[in-house]
Amino acid sequence: MPLGRAPRIGVGGPVGSGKTALVAALCRSLAPSLRLGVVTNDIYTTEDADFLRRAGVLDPQRIRAVETGCCPHTAIRDDITANLDTVEDLEADTGPLDLVLVESGGDNLTATFSYGLIDRQIFVVDVAGGDKVPRKGGPGVTLSDLLVINKTDLAPLVGADLGVMARDAAAARGPRPVLFTSLTADPTAGDVTAWVRAQLADLSPHGPRGATPAAAG
């Protein structure tokens, strides 16, 4: 990671998988000890940024929006200029920051971030799509640094077998981690928060400001 800037973690996944809700949960959990910024992506609106501002998860000045005007994956992978400019302006206006979360617009299972934009990426799917989703693969499922299988509380309602999803995700991802979440059961997204803290400790030789060894482990 280049010196002089905050670590950046991308959050991607299909429409409705719970990306914005996860970003909100991470902000609530991390903001007491870390200085955060968020950049959201939507095609023609600022809907996700507006949601986060209304939820009061951060100072509104530290939440910025990119209107991509094109397929979401283009702005996070193929031409990252708008996102890079927005992240850099965010840091210049409100920094120093400990972490910037970059949320992609909703896309399909092929969407991934350019590592010219972010340092780590989380890919979010949800059980409402059925237990076949991890088996379908795609770069988002197979190559992301963390796969989050969200909305596990809905599994009984849609007939999704979490054991099958765990097996297929492990087969698709090898050693890369997979976490199952329900923001209804755990609004803090505790396991994902712990993973983020571990990445910050790994990316920064001194760890983020406010992090303790226990929290960053």
Swiss-Prot record:
Keywords: Chaperone, Cytoplasm, GTP-binding, Nickel insertion, Nucleotide-binding. PANTHER family: UREASE ACCESSORY PROTEIN G (PTHR31715:SF0). Pfam families: cobW. Homodimer. UreD, UreF and UreG form a complex that acts as a GTP-hydrolysis-dependent molecular chaperone, activating the urease apoprotein by helping to assemble the nickel containing metallocenter of UreC. The UreE protein probably delivers the nickel. Belongs to the SIMIBI class G3E GTPase family. UreG subfamily. The keyword Nucleotide-binding applies. GTP binds at G13, P14, V15, G16, S17, G18, K19, T20. It is found in: Cytoplasm. NCBIfam families: ureG. GO terms for biological process: urea catabolic process. This is Urease accessory protein UreG. GO terms for molecular function: GTP binding; GTPase activity; nickel cation binding. The gene is ureG. One of its GO terms (cellular component) is cytoplasm.
